[in-house]
């Protein structure tokens, strides 16, 4: 009986068997270049060949960088060769760090201070500083720079009466010929005092109240220093005593802003 011939597989079966494996990548180094050939499947599930060409350059680097390149890799890259793997690592341009000192900033601040020196000028020694911080302040140098002051005639010494009583300064001028007893030199004989005014009283309201009676020379509305409200009284100086008497006659007992006004002659502050 003749021997059975060995059954050989067809070419289609061989292609089917080889379709699941890819050739291993190859590297060729020549003329300062490294040529890497790889095989992979594209989107259409077709086998393609990828060829990458790298230019080999040699750089002098510190020992620490060279040691880091020889570190053992781990994970999916445990079998990779030393250096970056082009499939997983993209090498970009080197970034060099430059450490700048603060000398430039200090120089800029010094220039700014130098420009401010010309602003301040001392009036005592004409130096480049304020007069308040002048080292010659209160010394003989400042006294020599001061302008001469015209001497003022000294006033007469305060006199005392024969009875030995103290005479206030406001009453001393009344003893001199031609001098009145009013310290402020005003005529209070035409002044009236209006009291019982409301807190909301203003100078405009006071002007409206007395302007129809007669011309006046001055008005004073007393106000509180803290609140600024009216204290309840005011003074009006008329130009004639007749107008002042008419104002007392008309306004005394007159109702204004729900209050009854009290108007009388202004009493002198220092009666003789």
Curated annotation (Swiss-Prot):
Pfam families attached to this UniProt entry: eIF3g (PF12353), RRM_1 (PF00076)
SUPFAM superfamilies noted in UniProt: RNA-binding domain, RBD
GO cellular component: eukaryotic 43S preinitiation complex; eukaryotic 48S preinitiation complex; eukaryotic translation initiation factor 3 complex
Keyword terms: Cytoplasm, Initiation factor, Protein biosynthesis, RNA-binding
GO BP term, example: formation of cytoplasmic translation initiation complex
Domain RRM: 190-268
Identification of the protein by name: Eukaryotic translation initiation factor 3 subunit G
Cross-referenced HAMAP family: eIF3g
Family, similarity comment: Belongs to the eIF-3 subunit G family.
Main location: cytoplasm
Keyword RNA-binding: yes
